[in-house]
Amino acid sequence: VGSEMCIRDRKYGTCERVAIGKGATAVVRVAHKWDRTEEKLYAIKEFRRRRKNETEKEYVKKLTSEFCISSTLHHINVIETVDLVQDENSHWCEVMEFCAGGDLYGAIKKGSLTAPEIQSYFKQTVQGIHYMHSMGVAHRDIKPENLLLDGNGHIKITDFGVSDVFRMCWEKSTHYSKGLCGSEPYIAPEQFECKEYDARLVDVWAIAIVFYTMQLQELPWRAARMSDPTFQEYVHAYASSATPSPLPNLSPRDCRPLLKKMLAPDPKQRCITDDVLKDPWLSQVSDTAKPS
């Protein structure tokens, strides 16, 4: 293959050999395409070969399901998915817009995020998820690694591998979701305990954990289970305290009531994205982060 890997029919240019992202199911590379005098960049998600215990039909269904979800979503805070193609080695590849700023995990690790950036990225994530929920889709794997920065002050939600359609466009009622998925520190408590759950509320929980992590560069607890002492203490203090520990660590003070509602251990008490966006504190937060 040499130092470059070309996508079938050169529609999206040539891929760099070095990956910009690696996950359990795929590798992501940058593709360069010259269009007259302008260079266009795409992110190419190259899916790994199917597992031995998976049929070809199951494998293709999984890939096309993810593409069918992601390609119908069009919002400033959701990654734009362009195409699903095969390369010359018959690898399935998803073509997406390229984000020059890397992922939020890298930005948190660097420790360079300002308070206005943190608040704006939080609001933008809520807006992106609110849009997805309005389309009947829950993400179910919100974490810093799945939030990309475009370099112009916008956050983009990516990776719809475990997303769930909880309401078809012709339906009025929502379906409950099943299955434990996502990364343990961001998983809502009901996912550990219940067979079925409202996936919208799982997303709300995860966004709140991301906000905490952006601010403090650490997680509030290892897992939202009663076997975790920090989480157990939080649950016991929740009913009696206006700001149960560790929420007093968050600033400004005005954000704490909202975060408490988003991190309600009982999903019946947790707020949905409509309520989050109506919060007086969040209403005055900017939709765009000015890059530091």
Regions found by a protein language model. Name each.
Residues 121-122:
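Activation segment signature within eukaryotic-like protein kinase domains
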Residues 87, 218-267:
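C-terminal lobe of the eukaryotic/viral protein kinase catalytic domain
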Residues 88-97, 105-106:
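A conserved loop-to-beta-strand element in the N-lobe of protein kinase catalytic cores
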Residues 27-51:
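Glycine-rich ATP phosphate-binding loop
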Residues 265-269, 273-289:
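Terminal C-lobe "cap" of eukaryotic-type protein kinase domains
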Residues 80-90:
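Short beta-strand micro-motifs within the conserved protein kinase catalytic domain, predominantly
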Residues 2-6:
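Short, small-residue-biased leader/transition segments that mark boundaries at the very start
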